[in-house]
């Protein structure tokens, strides 16, 4: 099989993507041909040769690098002809499936998914609509709330409203009245907790809101509950499977970017999570409902809060391309349920091809 692995990207999670893709490359059987395509931080795509794959395989601590070789610039060819998909320089890259290991913006927001649709290529993960909605935390919460699923109280703020003095005054009054301090503020369309923070008073709220607005033009203000953080891996197209939940116990104030990726002691990961049977069942069932409410396919990691005081379970958010690093929860939870890393990766690729075949049966135009 010819598999394109795409990594890097124009995202705050560029470095995380390099780590995730490195782990995936190590686990794919060498009988499969890999096209390693690195996207620079300014958005240029470059093909990397087999020597990069060998370097990653031989050293478990090695991380992918992106070499800017203009002779290896990758272009995407729209479908409709005999040769479609991906091309590096003058070299056509036969591709059976694409695994875009891109976290955050331009990876989980429907943009690259639309590109693959136009190129007529099977790709891992949700489609354009489901990923774009799931990237927007406000829209995700609206759909979950409409579906009767439990969410933490919140308000969403747009940049233009925040910049209007009268609207800003009303927003602050509403946040303090309806939600009360402490509050948690984060960009609506960013990942890995970048631009996010907890605030205990108005001055901190004003400061944190400006930080969050650096990452998106819409931010979320949530009630901050003292909670356990539990996650659940989900895979599937028409048949959805939720795996054994895991728990994150941060040593930081909250599970921020440093705790996730740069501080080896940033959090304790417990798989399985210390839950009773009722809680475990509720989380797995709710994860499936949350996934299906968003019309997701392929894979996602669904994140939960469990209120330490009341025991109530809330949905937090969903990640349509979760981390695949050596310490990432998604593959570990699948592994704890009996699906080892190498089989998981091939399962996701098979799901991508299956969905592609199903979608190709649909009519796209009237026959003349």
UniProtKB/Swiss-Prot annotation:
Main EC class the enzyme belongs to: ligase
Protein's GO biological process: cell wall organization; peptidoglycan biosynthetic process; regulation of cell shape
Domain of life, source organism: Bacteria
Cofactor binding description: Binds 2 magnesium or manganese ions per subunit.
Alphabetical list of SUPFAM superfamilies matching this protein: Glutathione synthetase ATP-binding domain-like (SSF56059), PreATP-grasp domain (SSF52440)
Binding positions (Mg(2+) 2): 317, 319
Pathway assignment: Cell wall biogenesis; peptidoglycan biosynthesis
Reactions it catalyzes: 2 D-alanine + ATP = D-alanyl-D-alanine + ADP + phosphate + H(+)
Binding, Mg(2+) 1: 303, 317
Cellular compartments annotated: Cytoplasm
Cofactor requirement: Mg(2+); Mn(2+)
Keywords: ATP-binding, Cell shape, Cell wall biogenesis/degradation, Cytoplasm, Ligase, Magnesium, Manganese, Metal-binding, Nucleotide-binding, Peptidoglycan synthesis
Entry GO CC: cytosol
Positions annotated to bind ATP: 176-231
Signal peptide: none
NCBIfam families: D_ala_D_alaTIGR, PRK01372.1, PRK01966.1-4
Family as reported in the entry's similarity comment: Belongs to the D-alanine--D-alanine ligase family.
Role this protein plays: Cell wall formation.
HAMAP family in the record: Dala_Dala_lig (MF_00047)
Protein name: D-alanine--D-alanine ligase
């Amino acid at each position: 099989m010819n598999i394109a692995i795409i990594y890097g990207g124009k995202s705050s999670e560029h470095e995380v993507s390099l780590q995730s893709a490195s782990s995936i490359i190590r686990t794919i059987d060498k009988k499969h041909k890999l096209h390693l395509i690195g996207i620079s931080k300014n958005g240029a795509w470059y093909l990397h040769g087999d020597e990069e794959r060998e370097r990653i395989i031989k050293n478990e601590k090695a991380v992918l690098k992106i070499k800017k070789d203009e002779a290896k610039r990758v272009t995407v060819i729209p479908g409709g002809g005999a040769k479609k998909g991906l091309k590096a320089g003058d070299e056509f890259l036969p591709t059976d499936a694409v695994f875009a290991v891109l976290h955050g913006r331009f990876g989980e927001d429907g943009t690259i998914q639309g590109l693959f649709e136009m190129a007529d290529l099977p790709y891992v993960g949700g489609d354009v609509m489901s990923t774009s909605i799931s990237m927007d935390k406000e829209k995700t919460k609206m759909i979950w709330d409409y579906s009767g699923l439990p969410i933490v109280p919140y308000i969403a703020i747009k940049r233009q409203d925040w910049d209007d003095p009268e609207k800003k005054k009303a927003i602050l009054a509403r946040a303090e009245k309806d939600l009360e301090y402490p509050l948690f503020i984060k960009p609506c369309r960013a990942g890995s907790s970048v631009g996010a923070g907890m605030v205990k008073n108005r001055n901190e709220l004003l400061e944190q809101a400006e930080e969050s607005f650096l990452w998106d033009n819409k931010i979320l203000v949530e009630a901050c509950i003292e909670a356990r953080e539990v996650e659940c891996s989900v895979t599937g197209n028409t048949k959805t499977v939720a795996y054994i939940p895991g728990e994150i116990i941060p040593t930081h104030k909250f599970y921020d970017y440093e705790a996730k990726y740069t501080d080896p002691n940033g959090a304790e990961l417990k798989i399985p999570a210390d839950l009773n049977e009722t809680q475990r069942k509720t989380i797995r069932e709710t994860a499936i409902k949350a996934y299906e409410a968003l019309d997701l396919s392929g894979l996602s990691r669904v994140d939960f809060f469990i209120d330490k005081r009341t025991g109530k379970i809330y949905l937090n958010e969903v990640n349509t391309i979760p981390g695949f690093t050596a310490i990432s929860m998604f593959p570990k939870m699948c592994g704890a349920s009996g699906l080892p890393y190498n089989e998981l990766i091939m399962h996701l690729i098979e799901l991508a091809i299956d969905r592609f075949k199903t979608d190709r049966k649909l009519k796209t135009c009237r026959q003349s």
